[in-house]
């Protein structure tokens, strides 16, 4: 204590000892600090006079704003004091701006949020009901004006809501982004307080409770007030009634309001139906604002399921749908109210449940509602509320009782559900419609299947398993897929037995098709065919007149045995001869007999007989095709284009008197791997080919005769005297041109007898002239070497291609000595041979031959023009030299030309003549049709002096061409040039050195060429 007085004395003496300037500065500083402190505390002091300290933070900003406005007015008055007129106009504008600004601030959502968040935080329980809470005093107004504040802008409010409704109607702002605030209320008396603001999307944790002497008639209890949520099913709830000894106020229960993530967490109480929640308020010393439900206070809405957190529709709603979403005293006209309610309903339907406008509650949703309602009823019990805010400890206890009232639900939103909906009615109706549609669809498809008008994939599967399914119907065997089909058919018990049976049949066929069907590229190798053939037994046909007995005599064990492999399609072909015992069984492994399903004449096309090539011959006997108990007569080979399968059936011998005299022979043509030819002496000849199915649309109906020919391979079995000869299956050839597919097979092997006959014919030929003999020798040389090339074709690919190229060059030429000569005593083969000879006489023109003829004609004309241009220089000397002196090379014309000279001339001419000779080989088959041209230099032809040149020369002699040139040179001395071979190709002077040498020799011999004549 002693130190403190001494310290004060020292400070006082020090301060007095200072100079006057320092003292003055301290005084000024103290004054400035006091003034600043006054300005800082002035708003607080002014608000403290009219409001409690708890509301200072809400009134500070407006007071500061009004202070600045007053200062601005003072400055403006001083500035405009001189001009009274300008001062009046500015003052009017300023007042209008202030009015508009105040209205906008009152209408702003932030202003109402602040007001709603701080309503009735006062702790005074005896507050005057005629005065508002201090937080309403946001502007510089008197307390009386604040107490009797009225929203006196009904017209402006209506315009504002008109604009909002238009925006909502056109969908400009979304409802979740707009806060519809009912900011305009029209009180009936001046003593009543304004009603609380209704927020459609702005939710606060504390709700307004206004105390007054009388209940405001603006919100009658007969009309509920709805608070709509955007994230869950919405309820139309009525306001709570606070029953007090002196007053009744509309209060909103916090649990009845939904959760909104933008403005905080609220709590909701699940109810079985929309309820009115009247409350009984028992006042103690101090009032409270709101309480939470005890049994749901611990769980926020975020962790609760939407079905459990919100009220769900009752299963049996009543027919009273006259419920308004908006209150009746909402300050908008009736038309705008209806538009707004419709918009809210549409938005709730679209955004809440994501359903269309016509909502049908499913059976699962109803069951879920029942379970949730049962759980909620057990948990929903009356509870107490706890106070919120600063004075929550002094809150009042309120007891809430749940009161059920039917008819207040979301009926208008959900589209007026019936009063007592029958469970399963909609489901039964939908199932019946589905069954009717399915019956009609299956009936149509069954008719198409019966008529054979199914797509390609379905028909292939149907043909693939037709045999096995027929036996399954007769209970001879059971396929593995039968159980699956029966399981699926049990679910389709409403179908007719015929329709169900057809559906099961199609399922079995489709399953087997996907199991058995293989692409043709996999079946290309011959080994795979051989393995499949060796594994399949040969089915013996009973000798009976009925063609259907073969199909029905197959046992069930074979079907089960061949389940993993495609069964054989059988087609019985019976001769029209009197003896019906000789049958020919033709089987193919991918298609089945279509006897039971497809009637004749539905989609069958008459088979057309096309003429074949001479080597294939014709059929001399009539064949009867017994297919699906129908017959059709054909006399020629059944031939298709490349798109269809080709099966050629030749006649078999009907007489049995000379059967033992003939032997069975099997000949396979290897030149075309995709074709197989089988020749049986005295037996039917069967030619089978394998081609790809046509590329057609899957939904395009195809004729039966085309589809039954789409097989993977053919197995030819011939039955004669209980002996069977099995033919190797054909190998599919995919990369073969259409022209080569159309061409028939030509035999490439010959027997010894045919060779002898060809030699005899060759010896008996008449004597030929030198020119014709050279032609014959050249042709015989070419055609004698062709069989050698064809014999080694399978082993050597280059020679195979050469052979095909030669046959393409000569499509009309037949190989001598390779013609089929039947043995004596075989009238059938003789008839076939006669028919072949007749066909040979028919001219055959190919497109390639025609093009080659035109090309050669053009080339010949060009060569003639070029020769004429080369011979024109010698035309001027023709008149001067009538007599030509003997040429120095005349001694070589008699065959005494030196060998060295011939070799010297032959060597350079060989390379040049190769290309020309190749060209001549390609067009040798049309030489007889081309005109033979001879060049004459004199009108009087003379015979050559030396007749020894008429002897035939060896065509294989390499000096033959040079000798012919010498012969032409000798003949040129007599003014005549005759080619040695009339059919010999004229060598091109551009490529052939021999022709250039001949022209050079003619030039040295001073031969004068006259004008050429063609």
UniProtKB/Swiss-Prot annotation:
Oligomeric and partner information: Interacts with ACTB and STX1A and/or STX1B.
Record-annotated membrane-spanning stretches: 22-42
Any one Pfam family match given in the protein's UniProt record, by short name: FAM75
Keywords for this protein: Cytoplasmic vesicle, Differentiation, Membrane, Spermatogenesis, Transmembrane, Transmembrane helix
The organism of origin for this protein: Mus musculus (Mouse)
Family from the record: Belongs to the SPATA31 family.
Cited function: May play a role in spermatogenesis.
Keyword presence, Transmembrane: yes
UniProt-annotated location(s): Cytoplasmic vesicle, Secretory vesicle, Acrosome membrane; Cytoplasmic vesicle, Secretory vesicle, Acrosome lumen
Name of the protein this chain belongs to: Spermatogenesis-associated protein 31
GO biological process: cell differentiation; spermatogenesis
Region of interest: Disordered: 925-961
Topology within the bilayer: Single-pass membrane protein
């Amino acid at each position: 204590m002693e130190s403190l007085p001494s310290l004060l004395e020292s400070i006082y003496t020090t301060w007095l000892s200072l100079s006057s300037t320092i003292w003055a500065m301290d005084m000024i500083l103290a004054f400035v600090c006091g003034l600043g402190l006054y300005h800082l505390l002035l708003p607080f002091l002014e608000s403290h006079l009219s409001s409690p300290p708890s509301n200072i933070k809400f009134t500070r900003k407006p007071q500061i704003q009004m202070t600045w406005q007053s200062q601005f007015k003072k400055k403006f008055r001083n500035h405009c004091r001189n001009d009274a007129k300008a001062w009046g106009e500015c003052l009017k504008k300023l007042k209008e701006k202030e009015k508009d600004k105040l209205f906008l601030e009152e209408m702003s959502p932030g202003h109402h949020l602040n007001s709603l968040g701080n309503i009735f935080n006062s702790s005074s329980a005896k507050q005057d009901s005629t005065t508002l809470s201090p937080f309403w005093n946001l502007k510089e107004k008197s307390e009386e004006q604040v107490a009797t504040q009225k929203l006196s802008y009904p017209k402006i409010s209506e315009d504002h809501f008109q604009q909002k409704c238009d925006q909502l109607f056109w969908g400009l702002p979304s409802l979740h982004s707009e806060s519809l605030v009912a900011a305009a209320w029209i009180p009936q008396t001046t003593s009543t307080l304004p009603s609380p603001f209704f927020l459609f999307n702005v939710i606060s944790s504390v709700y307004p409770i206004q105390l007054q002497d009388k209940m405001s008639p603006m919100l009658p209890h007969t009309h509920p007030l709805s608070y709509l949520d955007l994230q869950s099913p919405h309820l139309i709830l009525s306001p709570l009634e606070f029953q007090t000894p002196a007053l009744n106020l509309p209060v909103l229960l916090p649990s009845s309001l939904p959760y909104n993530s933008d403005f905080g967490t609220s709590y909701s109480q699940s109810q079985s139906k929309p309820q009115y929640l009247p409350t009984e308020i028992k006042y103690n010393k101090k009032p409270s604002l709101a309480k939470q439900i005890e049994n749901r206070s611990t769980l926020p809405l975020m962790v609760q399921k939407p079905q459990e957190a919100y009220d769900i529709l009752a299963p049996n709603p009543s027919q009273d749908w006259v419920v308004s979403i908006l209150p009746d005293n909402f300050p908008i006209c009736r038309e705008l109210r209806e538009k707004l309610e419709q918009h809210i309903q549409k938005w709730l339907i679209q955004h809440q449940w994501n359903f269309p406008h016509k909502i049908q509650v499913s059976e699962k949703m109803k069951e879920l509602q029942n379970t949730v309602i049962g759980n909620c009823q057990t948990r929903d019990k009356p509870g107490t509320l706890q106070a919120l805010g600063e004075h929550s400890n002094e809150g009042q206890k309120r007891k809430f009782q749940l009161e059920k009232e039917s008819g207040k639900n979301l009926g208008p939103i959900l589209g007026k559900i019936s009063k007592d909906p029958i469970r399963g009615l909609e489901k039964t109706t939908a199932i019946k419609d589905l069954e009717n549609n399915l019956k009609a669809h299956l009936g149509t498809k069954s008719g198409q299947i019966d008529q054979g008008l199914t797509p390609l994939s379905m028909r292939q599967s149907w043909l693939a398993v037709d045999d096995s399914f027929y036996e399954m119907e007769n209970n001879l065997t059971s396929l593995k897929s039968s159980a699956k089909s029966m399981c699926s058919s049990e679910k389709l018990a409403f179908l007719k037995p015929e329709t169900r049976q057809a559906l099961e049949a199609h399922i079995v066929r489709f399953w087997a098709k996907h199991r058995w069907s293989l692409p043709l590229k996999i079946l290309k190798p011959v080994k795979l065919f051989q393995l499949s053939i060796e594994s399949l037994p040969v089915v013996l046909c009973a000798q009976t007149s009925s063609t259907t007995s073969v199909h029905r005599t197959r046992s069930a064990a074979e079907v089960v045995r061949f389940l993993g492999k495609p069964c054989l399609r059988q087609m019985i072909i019976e001769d029209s001869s009197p003896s019906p015992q000789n049958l020919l069984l033709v089987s193919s492994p991918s298609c089945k007999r279509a006897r039971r399903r497809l009637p004749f004449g539905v989609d069958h096309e008459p088979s057309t007989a096309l003429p074949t090539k001479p080597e294939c011959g014709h059929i001399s006997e009539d064949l009867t095709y017994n297919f699906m108990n129908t017959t059709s007569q054909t006399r020629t080979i059944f031939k298709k284009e490349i798109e269809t399968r080709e099966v050629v059936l030749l006649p078999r011998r009907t007489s049995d008197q000379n059967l033992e005299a003939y032997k069975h022979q099997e000949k396979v043509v290897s030149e075309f791997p995709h074709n197989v030819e089988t020749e049986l002496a005295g037996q039917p000849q069967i030619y089978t080919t394998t081609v790809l199915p046509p590329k057609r649309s899957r939904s395009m109906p195809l004729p039966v005769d085309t589809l039954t020919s789409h097989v993977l391979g053919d197995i030819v079995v011939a039955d004669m005297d209980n002996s069977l000869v099995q033919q190797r299956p054909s190998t599919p050839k995919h990369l073969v041109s259409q022209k080569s597919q159309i061409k028939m097979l030509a035999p490439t092997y010959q027997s010894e007898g045919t060779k002898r006959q060809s030699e005899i014919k060759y010896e008996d030929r008449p004597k030929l002239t030198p020119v014709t003999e050279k032609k014959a020798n050249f042709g015989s040389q070419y055609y004698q070497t062709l069989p050698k090339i064809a014999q080694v074709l399978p082993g050597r690919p280059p020679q195979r291609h050469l052979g095909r190229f030669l046959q393409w060059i000569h499509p009309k030429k037949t190989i001598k000595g390779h013609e089929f000569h039947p043995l004596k005593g075989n009238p059938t083969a003789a008839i076939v041979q006669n028919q072949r000879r007749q066909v040979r006489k028919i001219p055959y023109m190919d497109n390639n031959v025609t093009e080659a003829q035109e090309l050669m004609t053009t080339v010949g004309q060009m060569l003639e023009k070029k020769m004429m241009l080369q011979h024109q220089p010698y035309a001027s000397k023709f008149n001067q030299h009538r007599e030509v002196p003997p040429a120095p090379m005349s001694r070589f014309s008699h065959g005494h030309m030196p060998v060295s000279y011939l070799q010297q001339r032959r060597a350079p001419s060989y390379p040049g003549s190769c290309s020309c000779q190749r060209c001549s080989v390609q067009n040798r088959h049309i030489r007889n049709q081309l005109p033979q041209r001879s060049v004459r230099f004199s009108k009087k032809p003379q015979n050559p002096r030396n007749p020894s040149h008429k002897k035939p020369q060896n065509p294989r002699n390499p000096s033959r061409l040079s000798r012919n040139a010498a012969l032409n040179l000798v003949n040129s001395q007599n003014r005549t040039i005759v080619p040695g071979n009339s059919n010999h190709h004229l060598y091109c002077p551009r490529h052939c050195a021999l022709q250039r040498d001949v022209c050079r020799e003619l030039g040295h011999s001073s031969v004068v060429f006259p004008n050429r004549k063609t």
